């Protein structure tokens, strides 16, 4: 978990500030020079290497995405509690389960916290979320939390202690209806699954060049914002919070388009991607994609 202050973000894009561990239980939780800060919690491999972003106010906190597995959601809960803040709001960026199945753990700890999403995302989850959770829970058992809750449609903006953060309109990435969050106070963007940094991406919903081009267009729009700090939806260990994630995704999607055009079988498609990108974390994502497209 990397803690970034406004001052350090503006002076050194994406650099972690300070090196003081909160305690031995959280060796990756680094204090900032200022309490006006945000931090990023990254899941382990079983949790899909997914990022949750925590914005820290003086007394309260805002969380963007809530993890997938029960162990990672519990670690996230413990990490938030260690900051001394009260979790005020949980915002969900899109309907993929690895970004919201952990809400039950967090709502148990902070029952008064608001759980919200862009109306388009909230509508999708109201329709499909509980069934999706029940199906996965039956297969995964104790690896998932015991309960799930649907977010309410966001109205009136995303705020914390007088600061307002911009929820962008839905964009196309590894799925439709992804809603990044712009944190202008930190010159930062929580890109969710529009950006993977250093890992394979979820390409199951990108079966052709047209869908890859739609994602590339979204990446171009993010790039044009010129934001210094870009928090990916998933990251490899040590991957930065910066535009390197956009570049990684652009390279990956161009390789995917080429491989789709030049291969006929799942094995050949996978081999072409590994040749183009090398071995990356999140191999499960690639395996699912090649079998969905060529299986």
Specify the residue positions occupied by each region the protein language model found.
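Divalent-metal (often Zn2+) His-rich catalytic cores of metallo-beta-lactamase-fold enzymes
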Residues: 182, 188, 213-268, 272
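Conserved beta-strand hairpin/beta-sheet module of binuclear metal-dependent hydrolase folds
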Residues: 33-82, 180-193
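N-terminal export signals
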Residues: 1-3, 8-29
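Active-site neighborhood of phospho(di)ester-bond hydrolases with catalytic His/Asp-centered motifs
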Residues: 64-66, 89-96, 116-118, 190-192, ...
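Active-site environment of divalent metal-dependent phosphoester hydrolases
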Residues: 49, 70-71, 95-100, 122-125, ...
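C-terminal regulatory/interaction regions
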Residues: 10, 14, 265-295
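Active-site HxH/HxHxD metal-binding segment of metal-dependent hydrolases
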Residues: 85-157
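Core dinuclear metal-dependent hydrolase active-site scaffold
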Residues: 155-186
């Amino acid at each position: 978990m990397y803690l970034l202050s406004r001052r350090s973000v503006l002076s050194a894009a994406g650099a972690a500030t300070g090196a003081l561990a909160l305690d031995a239980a959280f060796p990756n939780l680094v204090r900032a020079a200022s309490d006006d800060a945000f931090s990023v919690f990254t899941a382990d491999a079983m949790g899909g290497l997914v990022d949750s972003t925590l914005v820290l106010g003086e007394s309260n906190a805002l969380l963007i995405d809530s993890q997938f597995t029960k162990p990672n959601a519990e670690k996230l809960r413990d990490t938030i509690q260690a900051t001394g803040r009260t979790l005020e709001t949980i915002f969900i960026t899109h309907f993929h389960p690895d970004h919201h199945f952990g809400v039950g753990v967090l709502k148990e700890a902070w029952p008064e916290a608001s759980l919200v999403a862009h109306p388009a995302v909230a509508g999708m989850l109201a329709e499909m979320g509980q069934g999706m959770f029940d199906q996965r829970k039956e297969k995964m058992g104790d690896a998932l939390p015991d309960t799930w809750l649907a977010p309410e449609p966001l109205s009136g903006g995303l705020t914390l202690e007088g600061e307002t953060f911009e929820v962008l309109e839905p964009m196309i990435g590894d799925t439709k209806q992804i809603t990044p969050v712009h944190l202008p106070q930190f010159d930062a963007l929580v890109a969710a699954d529009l950006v993977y940094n250093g890992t394979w991406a979820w390409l199951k919903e990108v079966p052709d060049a047209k869908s890859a081009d739609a994602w590339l267009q979204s990446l171009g729009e993010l790039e044009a914002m010129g934001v210094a700090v870009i928090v990916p939806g998933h990251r490899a260990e040590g991957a930065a919070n910066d535009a390197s994630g956009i570049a990684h995704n652009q390279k990956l999607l161009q390789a995917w388009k080429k491989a789709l055009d030049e291969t006929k079988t799942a094995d050949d498609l996978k081999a072409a991607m590994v040749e183009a990108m090398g071995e990356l974390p999140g191999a499960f994502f690639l395996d699912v994609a090649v079998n969905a497209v060529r299986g």
